[in-house]
Amino acid sequence: MDSVAFEDVAVNFTQEEWALLGPSQKSLYRNVMQETIRNLDCIEMKWEDQNIGDQCQNAKRNLRSHTCEIKDDSQCGETFGQIPDSIVNKNTPRVNPCDSGECGEVVLGHSSLNCNIRVDTGHKSCEHQEYGEKPYTHKQRGKAISHQHSFQTHERPPTGKKPFDCKECAKTFSSLGNLRRHMAAHHGDGPYKCKLCGKAFVWPSLFHLHERTHTGEKPYECKQCSKAFPFYSSYLRHERIHTGEKAYECKQCSKAFPDYSTYLRHERTHTGEKPYKCTQCGKAFSCYYYTRLHERTHTGEQPYACKQCGKTFYHHTSFRRHMIRHTGDGPHKCKICGKGFDCPSSVRNHETTHTGEKPYECKQCGKVLSHSSSFRSHMITHTGDGPQKCKICGKAFGCPSLFQRHERTHTGEKPYQCKQCGKAFSLAGSLRRHEATHTGVKPYKCQCGKAFSDLSSFQNHETTHTGEKPYECKECGKAFSCFKYLSQHKRTHTVEKPYECKTCRKAFSHFSNLKVHERIHSGEKPYECKECGKAFSWLTCLLRHERIHTGEKPYECLQCGKAFTRSRFLRGHEKTHTGEKLYECKECGKALSSLRSLHRHKRTHWKDTL
């Protein structure tokens, strides 16, 4: 049998890591060790250089002393073990304790795995002999250890250093065994594979923990505030919020932290160390988690999907915030409408929808924004100093995903296809809005009862109630409820028409107008009435047509209550109340309230000429 090194199978826990293990994980560790000792008692094996009898007795004593919980007064907290059944059944472990009060380090592992194992069928029971010489002494503790490999492992100082680096993602590990198990996740060759995302795991316990990211299971509940968590380590970190415990203090600035990983991340703010690099663009990060999030901007991976509206997210925190929008049950409540949010800043941002406050104003175009982050992203479009620059039009973007979306306006690429009808879209959001026409799901409901399939349409609709038009054209003073409409209107002044039809060379100020125009040449009519089968080139025409069947008249006059199928008809009607007459006949100077009335009036002049 080939020899197996200790590092091949060891799982090393620092004191901090051991403290984060759940009761079930510690119980699993204890059960594995007990099963190992039972195997040692009965199997017919002997070791080349060690006698198994004393090892059995030593392991039993050590297990009773050290595997239940870490004692602050007798252990430094580093354990070596957590050996899976498959390895336990093949190799008999050796357990070396360090009993000194200074160290108390537990060396629970397969120290004899460097030796070859022989099965001797001639022996019916374990032989019991005294241990031989213990030539290896720990430099710091002065403890004698009988096996060289145990000494080498024990000698490693518990400084939290992780000398084994993953070449694929730069994550570091304290042992070679941990690194190899991590590499299995990259190569997808672990025996436990997630059916939802395909991620592979070597350990069933890690696989079950991962499954909770999909199922949403949260078995650990805080007794003080009832908040639940999917992982025991997350639960312990949360408990420290209540206790105020911050055991890890920065030596440079004295700032304290509740957990070791946060402390390490903070230390890098002083050293400037950024050990984790993006393999695609080379950008460096101080934390591996941030590297993973960043890499998704290149791959487009969005593993968290909302079941209500289909929106997807790069990371779980954004997904959680989004879900609160649907449920409205966040811990921080709006004083005006009672809606709940996940954090105080979100409440403040929401309250601006009631007050209309938009403190961030762009001095170049007059656009006002509610949030500083939106303002910074917007300014990049003017300054052109964003890291992502379009080679065709020179427009700059601060975010790779926004840049990729913009590129599609030039290439015409439509990577998002509807599975039901095959229609393709350039944006994932456009696909979600389209899919709602099939499913009929409209999760965003207005107080007036009208529902919408997407948030932007809902927000635009809300301005029809408030009458708010914060976006004003500096050329003519015309105001708009949405910045998009102002941008489109501005092009009527500048005559900027960057989008040209390849068939007739007609130019348009907006890309969507070009796409609609192209249907004149292609004859495409993608919008079909379900009642009568009549097809239309534009969605607005279909919606207007459907009102013939439904009898719906959504535009109502506030003064007399008369309703109309189209907003244009309502505007014309309202002039009968105000007396406003904008349309003047050039023949006789008569003023009329609507264009239709003007055309009818002109016919009276034509009759006179005839």
UniProtKB/Swiss-Prot annotation:
Q: Does the record's keyword annotation contain Transcription?
A: yes
Between which residues do disulfide bridges form?
none
Q: Cross-referenced CDD domains, in alphabetical order? A: KRAB_A-box (cd07765)
- Name the Gene3D superfamilies for this protein: 6.10.140.140, Classic Zinc Finger
What are its GO cellular component terms? nucleus
Recite the UniProt keywords alphabetically: DNA-binding, Metal-binding, Nucleus, Repeat, Transcription, Transcription regulation, Zinc, Zinc-finger
Q: Where in the cell is it found?
A: Nucleus
**Per its UniProt record, what InterPro entries does this chain match?**
KRAB, KRAB_dom_sf, Znf_C2H2_sf, Znf_C2H2_type
Q: Which GO terms describe its molecular function?
A: DNA-binding transcription factor activity, RNA polymerase II-specific; RNA polymerase II transcription regulatory region sequence-specific DNA binding; zinc ion binding
**Which SUPFAM superfamilies does UniProt cross-reference here?**
beta-beta-alpha zinc fingers, KRAB domain (Kruppel-associated box)
What Pfam families would the database entry show? KRAB, zf-C2H2, zf-C2H2_6
Q: Kindly list the biological process annotations in GO that this record carries.
A: regulation of transcription by RNA polymerase II
Q: Does the keyword Lyase apply?
A: no
Zinc finger map (C2H2-type):
164-186, 192-214, 220-242, 248-270, 276-298, 304-326, 332-354, 360-382, 388-410, 416-438, 444-465, 471-493, 499-521, 527-549, 555-577, 583-605
**Function according to Swiss-Prot or TrEMBL:** May be involved in transcriptional regulation.
Q: Which family does it belong to?
A: Belongs to the krueppel C2H2-type zinc-finger protein family.
Recorded protein name is: Zinc finger protein 823
Q: Which organism is it from?
A: Homo sapiens (Human)
